[in-house]
Amino acid sequence: MSLRRIMVTAVRNLHPVTLLPSPRINILYGSNGSGKTSVLEAVHLLGLARSFRSTRLNPVIQYEQAACTVFGEVQLTEGGTSNLGVSRERQGEFTIRIDGQNARSAAQLAELLPLQLINPDSFRLLEGAPKIRRQFLDWGVFHVEPRFLPAWQRLQKALRQRNSWLRHGTLDPASQAAWDRELCLASAEIDEYRRNYIKALKPVFERTLSELVELDGLTLSYYRGWDKDRELQEVLASSLLRDQQMGHTQAGPQRADLRLRLAGNNAADILSRGQQKLVVCALRIAQGHLVSQARRGHCIYLVDDLPSELDDQHRRALCRLLEELRCQVFITCVDHELLREGWQTETPVALFHVEQGRITQTHDHRE
């Protein structure tokens, strides 16, 4: 799938605009602070109903405007189109529309418009808390395993019940045992989906990484959130007193993590920032390959400030891998000449100049 048309209104400093992007490569260039990243943010808002720059959406709404709106016409892989729209009012009301109907949740957007983000904060996937790596993992599982979302929802409900009981003691023993059983069943299902996903991801990641950088000995492993040699029911029983003292469940899928190690060390501790960026790029490109295999479609990649921290050799290697995915890519940079020549002649490339929030298409992929 790809975006055929994007309409943006009142997002940060951007002037109202309608974009007709290339189905493949789109380069947004201009000076720092011109609004390039805000275009990526608008697409991110359309696909996930949230910003990657702020946990709050009010700062995304343009000053003195009541609401921001993003509309997109999506070219579906199987043919036909779908119309998506998101609107956020300053007073807090959020509206998601899919083909003229109100959507039940942002998950419906994510399913229609799978997005991958690579930006200067991407190193947090390696350096940040386990929650960030779980989100990365679960994004991938969600897009290849349709049974994952209902299992994840059951897990969250069971966890809320158990944690409430741990803090307040509001459940009788029979009810508590029933919720523990539900938690264990959902946990086993989630763990199976995650293990299968990592098994499929690892060889694709290793192959992709080898085309970007030589890091012999880098390993990717999955920790499920409790002892691999014990059943979760046993772990929960043995840690019950400690869980009550802490007020929450300490073992389970909500504690899962991905571990990247190099020479026996946490990879984030010894890799340079440029190497970390390449590892994250390899992980996200590998996810794109799995989405393509499972859905017969493609991710859309948002790449903010691609040239930063990468020399010409690695920049070209990354462009080549993105091109081989045959997906739609939106890239920002200051100097478009660094990227303009990095593609095959038959690949449609569109150029957009961004200056003080105004976007001008300077090269049309259809020409």
UniProtKB/Swiss-Prot annotation:
The keyword Hydrolase does not apply. Keywords: ATP-binding, Cytoplasm, DNA damage, DNA repair, DNA replication, DNA-binding, Nucleotide-binding, SOS response. ATP binds at residues 30-37. The keyword DNA-binding applies. One of its GO terms (cellular component) is cytoplasm. One of its GO terms (molecular function) is single-stranded DNA binding. Its main location: cytoplasm. Pfam families: SMC_N. One of its GO terms (biological process) is double-strand break repair. It is found in: Cytoplasm. NCBIfam families: recf. PANTHER family: DNA REPLICATION AND REPAIR PROTEIN RECF (PTHR32182:SF0). Belongs to the RecF family. The RecF protein is involved in DNA metabolism; it is required for DNA replication and normal SOS inducibility. RecF binds preferentially to single-stranded, linear DNA. It also seems to bind ATP. This is DNA replication and repair protein RecF. It comes from Pseudomonas putida (strain ATCC 700007 / DSM 6899 / JCM 31910 / BCRC 17059 / LMG 24140 / F1).
